[in-house]
Amino acid sequence: MNFKKMNFNSMKRIALSLMLVSVSMLSVQAQLLYKISKDSTDQKPSYIMASNRLMNPMGVVSLSGELKEALTNTDQMYFEVNKTAYKETINDAKKLADGKTLLSLLTPAQQTKLNAFLKKYMEVDFRSSYVQKKYGNLTPAALMEDMEQLLFVANHMGMYDPTHTFDQYFEAQAKANNETVGGLSDVDAYINATYKSDLKQQVARLVEFLENEPTELAKLNKAVGAFKAQDVDVAAKATGAHVSQPTLEAWAAKVQTVMAEKPTFFVVDAANLGGENGLLQLLRNAGCKVEK
């Protein structure tokens, strides 16, 4: 017997048990947890946990038997992007370069649409000092993220809490187990695809969101409802994947490389997991066994 391994796993179980006490009101959904393995190898299985970027995990995900087993029997944790390790880099990338401001990118008509949205949900004008300090130099994509959260929170008070996200929840698990944390996407690739993409396209997407508020809210509601129903395919269909198809394909390759090194616990947004072209299907296509 490998006493050191047994001792380490025992320590992990103790840490998980202590955390379970603190979240004893939660209920785990095994259908959001997938076991991934390669039939041709003797490597221990890895696991993928579906997450949702707008929901507070407290009350949705907890340490059930299946999840405790997955966390105990894996040796590292991977997210879509290791945002914690590169927090400052990502925050800097959200800001417009060369002294540009968001107002300078928007036409008067587009500014009017943004003002109407902010007045409805924040009761402030975009030109106010508070809003300018908070949003004035953000890229349209970064502002879009915040506006999407604002729209969802305003219509679902208590369901989203920026201090309790899925990534934060599972990062705490990794920290308790002294595990390595990594990202499926390199931080530079993530930044380039998200905040440094064509500004005109970013503005167009922001304006589309502002002009179609009811439709956008319906998409978010459907995705969240699908997540609660543990249906990643419907979640993916509701909003579409949040990343490009080439990125999903790169992730599928990275998952296989990482899990071949050591058993890994992956946390990926449900919208990126489900669907005919989602990460789970790409892994199946590559010969991986995907089990609920």
Mark where each language-model region is.
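Structured, acidic catalytic/metal-binding patches in enzyme active sites
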Residues: K38-T239
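A cross-kingdom marker for long, charged
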Residues: A238-K292
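Classical Sec-dependent N-terminal signal peptides that target proteins to the secretory pathway
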Residues: S17-M19, S24
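Bacterial N-terminal signal peptides that target proteins for export
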Residues: F3-L16
